[in-house]
UniProtKB/Swiss-Prot annotation:
GO terms for biological process: cytolysis; killing of cells of another organism; programmed cell death. Increases the activity of extracellular murein hydrolases possibly by mediating their export via hole formation. Inhibited by the antiholin-like proteins LrgAB. In an unstressed cell, the LrgAB products probably inhibit the function of the CidAB proteins. When a cell is stressed by the addition of antibiotics or by other factors in the environment, the CidAB proteins possibly oligomerize within the bacterial cell membrane, creating lesions that disrupt the proton motive force, which in turn results in loss of cell viability. Its main location: membrane. This is Holin-like protein CidA.
Amino acid sequence: MHKVQLIIKLLLQLGIIIVITYIGTEIQKIFHLPLAGSIVGLFLFYLLLQFKIVPLTWVEDGANFLLKTMVFFFIPSVVGIMDVASEITLNYILFFAVIIIGTCIVALSSGYIAEKMSVKHKQRKGIDAYE
């Protein structure tokens, strides 16, 4: 495929993911659920994939792109906290340790789950999962 076609394919797949997340946000608003809209969207996305309403091939490259660039999504929250550092009256070392540990736990658990799902998917397709 040409680079332009790959970029368009990636953008369309990211668009599907964004639309599903947006629908989850709207569901959360309509039903006043006690969960974040993005979490509702993630659960909706999971159900759509499990019941094969949305085939994995429609979003696989876009999801892999997001997984590869996931670390960049954690940077704004850390920078945002640094902007309000003067308002934080806690012990700074403890506060930043909790932030760093929490970020690492989220990143590691997300990566672990994604890896397990990838291995399971490859095994279903009959591909050597640990190539």
